[in-house]
Design a protein with these regions (language model features):
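Generic domain-boundary/flexible-linker signal
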Residues: 44, 142-144, 179
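Predominantly the structural core of cysteine protease catalytic domains
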Residues: 78-172, 222
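Short, well-ordered loop/turn elements at secondary-structure boundaries
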Residues: 2, 126-128, 178
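Active-site-adjacent structural segments surrounding the nucleophilic cysteine of cysteine proteases
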Residues: 1-90, 97, 156-159, 222
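Noncatalytic regulatory segments and standalone regulatory/sensor domains
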Residues: 149-223
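Ser/Thr- (and often Asn-) enriched beta-sheet segments in non-cytosolic proteins
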Residues: 7, 105, 181-183
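Solvent-exposed loop/turn segments at secondary-structure junctions
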Residues: 40, 137-141, 174, 189-191
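Repeat-unit-sized solenoid/scaffold elements
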Residues: 66-78, 118-119, 126-129, 133-134, ...
């Protein structure tokens, strides 16, 4: 994966990503990736409101106000549990409650058919909606390594995502090889993951459950 890729779809504005590792709560630092991704998604949509004259978001990620926002979500909308984190179905319910409260024209559900993932991701990005994507259990490559490799600056890093939520902010294609990649944010940094590695990765001994654990929060516009 390298720079100079063809952009197939991407968010229209800068996406600010928080970092769960910066939180003092051991529970959020260890299991809060879904909560952080969910909070950043809400703030991005709140900032869209601000651009169109509505109530805005925080404008940045980090600091006391951001921590307070995360804590309120954890208490009221999207509780993080130790050793479990935040599951996708709870995330969809929490998003729909929040959308109704703010009058947003969106509806969310967890998981879509695996073959439709690229299409759904493109649809959401074209509608300027960040895509929360989970990398679930059962992912491994031919060498037996678990998780999905993360790339930065065109090079494979030593970091791998497994049992983890990331946020897709772009979908790209290498003009020479035709290889496609998802541009993501995680732990407050931007990476890329191979679309084929993610889409074709093992889903474990029970594919149905693997598909549920490795999927997206699908948010569609209702108007």
């Amino acid at each position: 994966m390298r720079r100079g890729n063809i952009i197939l779809a991407e968010l229209k504005h800068t996406y600010f990503a928080g970092n769960q590792n910066e939180f003092r709560s051991p529970r959020i630092a260890s299991y809060g990736c879904g909560l952080i991704g969910f909070a950043d998604l809400l703030l991005y949509l709140m900032e869209q409101d601000w651009r169109t004259g509505g109530a805005g978001g925080l404008g940045t990620r980090g600091g006391k106000k951001y921590e307070e926002f995360i804590s309120r979500l954890d208490r009221s909308f999207a509780r993080v549990y130790s050793h479990i984190g935040l599951n996708g179905f709870s995330m969809a319910i929490a998003f729909n409650r929040r959308a109704r409260k703010r009058g947003w024209p969106y509806r969310a559900r967890w998981a879509v058919p695996r073959k439709k993932l690229p299409e759904i991701i493109c649809e959401m990005l074209e509608n300027d909606i960040p895509v929360i994507l989970s990398v679930g259990p059962g992912f491994h490559d031919r060498r037996g390594e678990h998780g999905v490799a993360l790339y930065r600056n065109g090079r494979r890093t030593e970091v791998r995502a497994r049992d983890h939520y990331v946020t897709v902010i772009g979908y790209e294609e290498d003009p020479e090889s035709g290889e496609r990649s998802f541009r993501i944010v995680s732990w407050g940094k931007e990476y890329r993951i191979s679309a084929s590695e993610y889409l074709n990765g093992s889903t474990g001994s029970i594919p149905f459950l693997g598909n549920l654990f490795s999927n997206v929060l699908y948010i569609r516009k209702t108007v």
